[in-house]
């Protein structure tokens, strides 16, 4: 494995662990030239998951988009980034375990919202405000009322 810092091809593995619930192997490596450490992941090369957007366009699934959306929703909230990565990986795993190769962005958004609702109500409302694209304050207040009343349709 080539060192990302100095380009040297001589690196050694100093730690190996299962990652992503056993679907990947995480390796810590150290460059024998510059002594810097870096992490690599080994994963199965599986069929791609396609996301069908609201406008009908399609793109490859990207777990990182879920993670960055979670980060934005949870900004300045007492939630560990590792928990957000865990949620993104859980959603990815759930989607890949389905037999369908395509998933709608709507389904992904609902999966994120259901997990955020359990994790942190403020983060849930933040995410919902962007995801549901509230047209005005009243529609936003309706979502808050559902949350406060324990409504199932939120």
UniProtKB/Swiss-Prot annotation:
Span of zinc fingers (unnamed) = 3-34
Per the record, the domain of life is Bacteria
Cofactor descriptive note: Binds 1 zinc ion.
Q: Which GO terms describe its biological process?
A: negative regulation of DNA-templated transcription
**Is Hydrolase a UniProt keyword of this protein?**
no
Q: Which UniProt keywords apply?
A: ATP-binding, DNA-binding, Metal-binding, Nucleotide-binding, Repressor, Transcription, Transcription regulation, Zinc, Zinc-finger
Which GO MF terms are attached to this record? Answer: ATP binding; DNA binding; zinc ion binding
Domain called ATP-cone: residue spans: 49-139
Write down the required cofactor(s). Answer: Zn(2+)
- HAMAP family per the record? NrdR
The family classification in the record reads: Belongs to the NrdR family.
Matching entries from NCBIfam families are given as: transcriptional regulator NrdR
Function description = Negatively regulates transcription of bacterial ribonucleotide reductase nrd genes and operons by binding to NrdR-boxes.
Q: What protein name does the entry list?
A: Transcriptional repressor NrdR
Provenance organism: Carboxydothermus hydrogenoformans (strain ATCC BAA-161 / DSM 6008 / Z-2901)
């Amino acid at each position: 494995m080539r060192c990302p810092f100095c380009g040297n091809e001589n690196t050694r593995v100093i730690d190996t662990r299962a990652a992503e619930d056993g679907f990947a192997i995480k390796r810590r490596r150290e460059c024998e030239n510059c002594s810097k450490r870096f992490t690599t992941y080994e994963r199965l090369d599986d069929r791609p998951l396609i996301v069908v957007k609201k406008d009908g366009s399609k793109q490859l699934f990207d777990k990182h988009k879920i993670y960055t959306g979670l980060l934005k929703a949870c900004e300045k909230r007492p939630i560990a980034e590792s928990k957000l990565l865990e949620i993104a990986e859980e959603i990815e795993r759930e989607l890949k375990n389905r037999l369908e190769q395509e998933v709608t962005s709507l389904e992904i958004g609902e999966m994120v919202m259901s997990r955020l609702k359990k994790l942190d109500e403020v983060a849930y409302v933040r995410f919902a405000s962007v995801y549901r694209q509230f047209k005005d304050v009243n529609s936003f207040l309706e979502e808050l009322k559902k949350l406060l009343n324990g409504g199932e349709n939120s």
